[in-house]
Design a protein with these regions (language model features):
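Long, intrinsically disordered low-complexity tandem-repeat segments
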Residues: 259-301
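PAS-family sensory/regulatory modules and their coupling/dimerization elements
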Residues: 210-263, 293-296, 300, 313-349
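Recognition helix of helix-turn-helix DNA-binding domains
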Residues: 364, 377-412, 436-437
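Short, basic, alpha-helical segments at the C-terminal edge of helix-turn-helix-like DNA-binding modules
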Residues: 410-421
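Regulatory input/activation interfaces that engage signals or partners
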Residues: 1-145, 149
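The N-cap/first-turn positions of alpha helices
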Residues: 366-370
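PAS-family sensory domains
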Residues: 165-233
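Short amphipathic alpha-helical segments
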Residues: 3-16, 87-91, 156-160, 164, ...
């Protein structure tokens, strides 16, 4: 069962217990927590960029917030005390579609975050109940494990090459997640990620998600990296990243140093009309003296010109008291001006694949360490020395890895983890060195 079929089946089972009218379910990169591969049925697909930006731009029932909470489930109406206007997502998108409540669930385990689900309920049905939340809380751990195992199946076969020969894949977006430009090579890649509707260009949600995560990081909502690894097909993984293009500062030529002419008059040097007497030079210009005097006088009088005074700050004396500011989920976005966002798509690196492989199969830290040493060509003796364990312990770790991954030897493990058989010749030459368990 792939991840989409799994999610469809889980939702069908949920409908018998929890009533909902729409849903959004994303897989996530287990480390960065950024969403990929959405499975959704919502009434606002044309507003997808706005919805994604709002979802990432608030900590209110955010999946990363729920990961650190006592429960993996959050009910929107309960969280805001019935005042839905406090929710940014509701104000900017859901309010126009008669959404009355949202049940948010994160699916995470000790190996990472594997997805999050938002169930929407029409305002005519009434809010979600505590019983609904308890049910979702009970099933969340099992669903998290199932999602993780689904991701692990993407490593069963050696990756089929999908490299494009048309150059780098990059898109630029503004802060409202509108596509501004794209490289010519992006079309083929994006259509593989998300086949487009006829007459429309394909823009997978992963592009919007990494861009929205960058905006969230810039505004201080969440500090995870703006990147995500997504499975394309046949064991092939792509990494999607977002960054902000920086503007080069305008450089002005340094002013030429002032040439000071001096004239020796009876052993005295004149500098700008000031005489140096007894080795002491007075170089204070009249304008500087006047300016200094004005600054001192202003400080003594307790203020400056009205145009230079700092306006009162909210919550400080003379301003608006802090406790009068309404408690509302206010967006902290930067304005949609200035440098644009750039999103790149590239083949996932070997190191990133190894990390993902270890997490999806639930390897222990020591098994993960051993896998990394195998990847750089270590044999059993060298690995035992580096891990400071016996060779027998290395063999035990290998047996555990083989059992979890379904592989029968280290060559198969590495070929699946790295997505290629290249570079494994050294491992293939050591069949007797603890290669099989």
């Amino acid at each position: 069962v792939d991840a989409t079929a799994l999610r469809r089946g889980v939702l069908d089972a949920m409908r018998g217990v929890v009533e909902f009218d729409a849903f959004v379910w994303l897989l996530t990169d287990p480390v960065t927590t950024v969403g990929v591969a959405p499975f959704a049925q919502v009434p606002c697909l044309p507003e997808l960029p706005r919805l994604i930006k709002a979802k990432y731009g608030t900590g209110l029932n955010r999946w990363t917030t729920l990961m650190g909470a006592g429960s993996p489930v959050g009910l929107l109406r309960d969280t805001v005390g019935g005042a839905l206007i406090r929710s940014r997502v509701w104000r900017e998108v859901m309010s126009r579609h008669a959404v009355g409540d949202v049940a948010s669930t994160v699916f995470a385990d000790r190996f990472g975050c594997w997805g999050f689900l938002d169930l929407w309920r029409d305002d005519r049905r009434g809010p979600f109940s505590r019983a609904d939340a308890e049910f979702l809380t009970q099933v969340a751990p099992s669903v998290a494990t199932a999602l993780r195992l689904c991701q692990s199946r993407a490593f069963v076969e050696v990756a089929t090459p999908h490299r494009q020969e048309h150059g780098p894949v990059a898109l630029t977006l503004d802060d409202d997640l509108r596509i501004l430009s794209r490289t010519s090579a992006s079309k083929a890649w994006l259509e593989r990620l998300l086949p487009p509707v006829p007459s429309e260009q394909a823009v997978p949600a992963s592009v919007y998600n990494v861009a929205a995560q960058l905006l969230a990081a810039e505004s201080g909502v969440d500090d995870h990296p703006a990147s995500a690894r997504v499975h394309l097909a046949d064991g092939f993984w792509l990494t999607v990243r977002a960054a902000r293009l920086s503007e080069e500062p305008t450089r002005h030529p340094e002013p030429e140093p002032e040439v000071v002419r001096t004239a020796e008059v009876g052993g005295t040097a004149e500098v700008g009309g000031t005489a140096e007497v007894g080795g002491t030079a007075e170089l204070v210009r009249t304008a500087e003296v006047v300016r200094t005097a004005e600054v001192v006088r202003t400080a003594e009088l307790g203020g400056g010109p009205a145009s230079h005074r700092e306006p009162p700050r909210p919550g400080l004396s003379g301003g608006v008291p802090a406790d009068t500011v309404p408690s509302i989920d206010v967006p902290a976005d930067r304005p949609s001006v200035g440098p644009t966002l750039v999103v790149t798509i590239e083949e996932t690196s070997a190191a990133e694949r190894l990390e993902l492989f270890a997490r999806t199969f639930g390897l222990t830290p020591r098994e993960d360490e051993l896998l990394g040493l195998l990847a750089v060509g270590g044999d059993t003796r060298a690995i035992a020395r580096q891990m400071m364990v016996s060779e027998l312990t290395v063999q035990d770790h290998l047996k555990s890895i083989f059992g979890k991954t379904g592989a029968h030897d280290r060559v198969t493990v590495l070929s699946r983890a790295l997505g290629t058989r290249r570079g494994l010749a050294s491992a293939e030459r050591r069949p007797a060195d603890g290669d099989r368990a």
